[in-house]
């Protein structure tokens, strides 16, 4: 069985995982992960990861909507291939990343994104002001 997790596992697992990449100034880590269901939250072997194209002017909610849209489109393609009998190799998660709980999120976190950064974190990232790491994604389409 597969789960669609709205976050990039293993880096952002658990709750509000389209928010936390913005809080940590990593909007390029906003994405979705298709993975096997396991007892540990969002820790199953990965089939595919989707990330949206980031564009100037995108805010946190734009990126969240784009993530759902691209994950849906890519899942359709994956499902069509599964129906035709294609088998995919799954990639075991090599690290635990961070498991975020609902209790971790406070309204002050969101105020920081809006008040301190004026919801322009994507703009800062695209301008090269934030630097940072780049996720190595598992992709099958």
Regions found by a protein language model. Give the residues of each.
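Donor/substrate-binding cores of folate-linked one-carbon enzymes
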Residues: 1-111
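Internal anion-binding site segments
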Residues: 94-141
């Amino acid at each position: 069985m597969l789960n669609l997790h709205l976050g990039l596992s293993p880096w952002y697992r658990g709750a509000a995982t389209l928010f936390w990449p913005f809080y940590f100034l990593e909007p390029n880590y906003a994405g979705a992960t298709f993975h096997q269901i396991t007892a540990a939250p969002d820790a199953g072997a990965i089939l595919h990861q989707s990330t949206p194209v980031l564009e100037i002017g995108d805010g946190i909610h734009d990126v969240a909507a784009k993530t759902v849209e691209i994950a849906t489109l890519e899942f359709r393609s994956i499902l069509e291939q599964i129906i035709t009998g294609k088998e995919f190799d799954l990639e075991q998660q090599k690290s635990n990343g961070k498991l975020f709980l609902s209790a971790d999120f406070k309204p002050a976190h969101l105020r920081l994104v809006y008040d301190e950064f004026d919801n322009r974190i994507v703009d800062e990232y695209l301008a090269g002001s934030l630097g940072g790491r780049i996720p190595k994604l598992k992709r099958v389409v």
